[in-house]
Amino acid sequence: MVPSIKVTKILDPIFENRCLVPFISFSENESFPDGTKPPVWFALSEDRPLAFFAGIWTPQWKSVRKVKEGETTNALFAFLTTAPNTEVGVIHPKAMPVIFTTPDEIETWLTVQTPEAMRLQRPLPDGALKIVARGERKDG
């Protein structure tokens, strides 16, 4: 697992609002010596089946997102990250999203107490993801 700053006490209430973020593929930018950073697209297979990121949400996040608007209250979500597996680590060595692929993982994430749910914060096994495309999206 990626070492993290101990902010869980501050964020405890947010972790009570767990959700799923559906996806069929996701990208990480590959860095080249010339400064270019084209995206590399990952999925469970070439068919790009549905999977889910481990998400958290809050309905009342107060912040200044645009100076002209001042402080606003927004509903926000984010997804958790963890250490990368082999496939993602070659492109992005620091982290990858926490991904659920089974009904049991989904049920656990959505229903159990936070300490037990956080045990799901781990990378997919090596070989579970495939590079399905490189470069800018061309499918929409």
Question: Can you annotate each of these PLM segments?
Answer:
Residues 1-140:
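A structured binding-face within diverse protein domains that lines the active/interaction site
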